[in-house]
């Protein structure tokens, strides 16, 4: 999205060029950043511009993806101004030069005093008296570290709470997960930590990992090699755009048939097929039908929350048909018979529960698991995301799905895989979590626990389950501290620490937000610390096929903002100095080891030390071969990087990685076998069932293509705000008529857990009694009506809530300016 502009300044041939992985979704498209002095520009002849393209004539289609939104003018700390251009890299195997609406705006979101990023935090900001004031890092650290120290001394680590990112991409990455993790887990040693998108410190894939199969186990190329692709609880066009466009669609179009024949010469290859499992007909379904036709696309529009029954029915059927890999099961797995017995569900029972006709279930099974004419089992890839991750008992759904996948040997063979599609990129390197159980942090806060709460690179006021209850509790507790601080006129920093601590003894909570912007958390915060994002810092992350790349720094961050890992180091060093001053050598020693000057120092301290002699325990997605990865080697690898785990490095080949896991039949369990896991169908959780019985509408929710996460950038983009002035809710037109609402009307959405407001968006493809609301938006928070239910691992059922809807009124401006045409673009 960009404003009309009749020309773009081209980079001169000598412009600086660096590598950038897209900040946003897990696909991690490769981009090049060009930077050159503001008053210079390149010519239209290919030798006169850094793109090497001939702009003197019409370029061929897709010769380059280039829009005004991919350009900006930035100012360095020394006052010098530079043009920047952030364009997709055609040589990157991930995106092959394709851009997305999210990545295509990266340049626009780099900080400029008058641009979309003008609201960025530029200095630590303190809530003083009744207003926000910018302050110094030294002052901020004296207050923040001083309060942590007092809490540790008086209450121990249990008084210090965090909600923190655990991902890659912007606001994450291996450097930053290590810096924050080392501070929280090794230095402060608090177990009172939750992750950005779930209310405890846990995994989203406990079951699959226990079964021996990590969730990112294939390569994007495997989607090109598959006979059948399953998309389960996932909308890949909108959520993983260029994985879908650059790897899935070419297979559906027949463009990868020659590659399949070359790889597997003894197999026949019918035209590729795709199966969607989703109660909602998404834009991805519409596009797939347009590309492949109805005869190669199945949409299993299951009843909400019935995924486990679906997979159990299919598992039972393929076992009965003999469409399983018996030698593989015998040699490389454990627990098959128990799973067959526990998961047994006939197709008739499966159909009654899921609402999917028996003939459609049989067709899905035949496409995916019945041997091909050449005798081999189909190569079937199962890709899943939030419909399972945030589904009806994540643990059991994953178990049921993987039982089916293991039995049919659709993991460890090229063209297969049972994989998460993912949200953010990945980038996890941390010390082991210091707790012995999973703690529901939101509920602890609601109950009045904790003295200091830091939200780091996340915003649970917009994203948590049962969000309204969380906000109400935090705002009430925060107000107690604000009132105490307002009365402490003339207090020194040390005295203010005492004032704040006393207020927390009276039920208060000191709130800190570390982020790019003053998010909705500013309503509760007392201190905000300014962070940096890729391009303003060096950052490594890995994408959904475990491909690690280096996003290189090319500009200064705004003001005194800095990388999260360096913020963590600053906090740790402040605490070390305080304990040394007190003569507490043992406590001071906990905060040693943060003498980092650059992001590379943090990368070397964490990612590269994992599994090495003399290093402490480090949980890292780079594993024990991460030491082979250096910034210099990643620079040489460009936007293609290397797929983790790294196998080797030498001067001629560079970094050599791993395309697919489990190809030799050895899995991540103690005995090296894949473990089947019994997964009975148990219906809906009681809390959720109560809402369904009481209220009319299923309140489904998720992302769309244009808005990234909480709209932390997008809320400042005028075009985005014109398109989505508030969160929309897709509704069936007949339901709209019954409620007397049309596109642009405002409705209240409510149930026993809260209420929120949304803009009506009529959609013919939405079933009656079902809705879909934009998740995590800044204006209209869907999480207010999700329940407080979680599974055994404290994983919420974000998708599982029901409520009623009532008309509030009409917004004539919305009706006049917002398009309510179908988003099923095909």
Swiss-Prot record:
InterPro entries: AioA/IdrA_3Fe-4S, AioA/IdrA_lsu, Asp_de-COase-like_dom_sf, MoPterin_dinucl-bd_dom, Mopterin_OxRdtase, Prok_molybdopt-oxidoreductase. Its EC number is 1.20.9.1. Substrate binds at residues 196, 204, 420, 424. It catalyses: 2 oxidized [azurin] + arsenite + H2O = 2 reduced [azurin] + arsenate + 3 H(+). One of its GO terms (molecular function) is molybdopterin cofactor binding. GO terms for cellular component: membrane; oxidoreductase complex. The keyword Oxidoreductase applies. It is an enzyme of class 1 (oxidoreductase). Keywords: 3Fe-4S, Iron, Iron-sulfur, Metal-binding, Molybdenum, Oxidoreductase. Its cofactor is [3Fe-4S] cluster; Mo-bis(molybdopterin guanine dinucleotide). The record marks 100 as: Involved in charge transfer. This is Arsenite oxidase subunit AioA.
């Amino acid at each position: 999205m960009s404003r009309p502009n009749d020309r773009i300044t081209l980079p001169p041939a000598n412009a600086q060029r660096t590598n950038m992985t897209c900040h946003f979704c897990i696909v991690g498209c490769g981009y090049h950043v060009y930077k050159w002095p503001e008053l210079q520009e390149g010519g239209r002849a290919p030798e006169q511009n850094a793109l090497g393209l001939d702009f003197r004539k019409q370029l061929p289609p897709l010769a380059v993806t280039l829009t005004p939104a991919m350009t900006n003018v930035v100012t360095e700390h020394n006052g010098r101004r530079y043009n920047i251009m952030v364009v997709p890299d055609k040589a990157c195997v991930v995106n092959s030069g394709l851009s997305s609406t999210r990545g295509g705006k990266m340049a626009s979101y780099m900080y400029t005093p008058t641009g979309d990023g003008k609201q960025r935090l530029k200095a630590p900001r303190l809530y003083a008296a009744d207003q926000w004031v910018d302050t110094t890092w030294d002052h901020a650290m004296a207050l923040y570290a001083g309060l942590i120290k007092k809490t540790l001394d008086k209450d121990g680590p249990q008084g210090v709470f965090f909600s923190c990112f655990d991902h890659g991409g912007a606001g994450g990455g291996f450097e930053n997960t290590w810096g924050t993790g080392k501070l929280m887990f090794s230095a402060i040693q608090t177990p009172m930590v939750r992750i950005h998108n779930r209310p405890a410190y846990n995994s989203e894939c406990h079951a699959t990992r226990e079964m021996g199969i990590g969730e990112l186990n294939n390569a994007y190329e495997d989607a090109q090699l598959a006979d059948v692709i399953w998309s389960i609880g996932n909308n890949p066009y909108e959520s993983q755009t260029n994985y879908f466009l650059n790897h899935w669609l070419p297979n559906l179009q027949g463009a990868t048939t020659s590659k399949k024949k070359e790889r597997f010469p003894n197999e026949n290859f019918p035209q590729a097929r795709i199966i969607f499992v989703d109660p909602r007909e998404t834009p991805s379904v519409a596009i797939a039908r347009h590309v492949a036709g109805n005869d190669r696309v199945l949409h299993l529009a299951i009843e909400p929350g019935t995924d486990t029954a679906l997979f159990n029915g299919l598992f039972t059927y393929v076992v009965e048909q003999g469409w399983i890999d018996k030698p593989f099961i015998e040699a490389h797995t454990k627990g098959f018979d128990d799973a067959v017995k526990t998961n047994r569900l006939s197709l008739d029972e499966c159909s009654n529960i899921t609402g999917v006709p028996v003939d459609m279930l049989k067709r899905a099974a035949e496409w995916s698991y019945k041997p091909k004419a050449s005798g081999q089992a189909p190569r079937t890839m199962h890709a899943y995301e939030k419909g399972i991750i945030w589904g009806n008992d994540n643990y059991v759904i994953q178990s049921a799905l993987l039982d089916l996948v293991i039995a049919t040997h659709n993991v460890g063979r090229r063209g297969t895989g049972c994989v998460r599609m993912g949200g953010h990129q990945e980038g996890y390197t941390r010390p082991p979590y210091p707790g012995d159980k999973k703690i529901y942090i939101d509920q602890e806060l609601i109950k009045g626990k904790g003295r200091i709460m830091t939200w780091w690179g996340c915003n649970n006021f917009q994203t948590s389950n049962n969000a309204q209850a969380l906000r109400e509790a935090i705002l009430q507790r925060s107000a107690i501290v604000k009132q105490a601080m307002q009365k402490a006129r003339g207090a020194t920093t040390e005295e203010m620490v005492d004032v704040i601590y006393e207020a927390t003894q009276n039920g208060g909570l000191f709130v800190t937000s570390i982020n790019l912007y003053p998010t909705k958390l500013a309503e509760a915060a007392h201190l905000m610390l300014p962070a940096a994002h890729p391009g303003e810092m060096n950052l490594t992350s890995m994408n959904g096929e475990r491909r690690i790349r280096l996003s290189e720094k090319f500009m200064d961050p705004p003001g005194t903002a800095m990388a999260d890992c360096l913020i963590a180091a600053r906090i740790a060093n402040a605490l070390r100095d305080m304990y040394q001053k007190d003569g507490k050598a043992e406590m001071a020693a906990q905060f040693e080891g943060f003498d980092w000057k650059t992001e590379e120092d943090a990368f070397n301290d964490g990612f590269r030390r994992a599994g090495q002699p003399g290093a402490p325990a480090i949980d890292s997605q780079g594993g024990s071969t991460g030491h082979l990865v250096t910034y210099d080697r990643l620079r040489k690898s460009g936007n293609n990087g290397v797929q983790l785990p790294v196998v080797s490095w030498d001067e001629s080949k560079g970094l050599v990685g791993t395309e697919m896991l489990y190809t030799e039949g050895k899995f991540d369990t103690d005995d090296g076998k894949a473990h089947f896991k019994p997964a009975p169908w148990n219906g809906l959780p009681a809390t959720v069932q109560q809402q369904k019985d009481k209220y009319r509408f299923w309140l489904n929710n998720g992302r769309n293509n244009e808005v990234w996460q909480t709209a932390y950038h997008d809320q400042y983009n005028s075009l985005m705000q014109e398109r989505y002035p508030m969160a929309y809710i897709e509704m069936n037109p007949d339901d709209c008529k019954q409620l007397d609402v049309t596109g642009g009307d405002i409705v209240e959405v409510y149930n026993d857990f809260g209420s929120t407001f949304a803009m009506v968006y009529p959609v013919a493809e939405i079933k009656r009694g079902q809705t879909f609301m934009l998740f995590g938006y800044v204006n209209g928070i869907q999480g207010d009506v999700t329940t407080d239910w979680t599974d055994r691992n404290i994983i919420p059922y974000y998708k599982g809530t029901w409520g009623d809807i009532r008309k509030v009124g009409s917004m004539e401006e919305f009706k006049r300016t917002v398009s309510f045409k179908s988003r099923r673009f095909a």
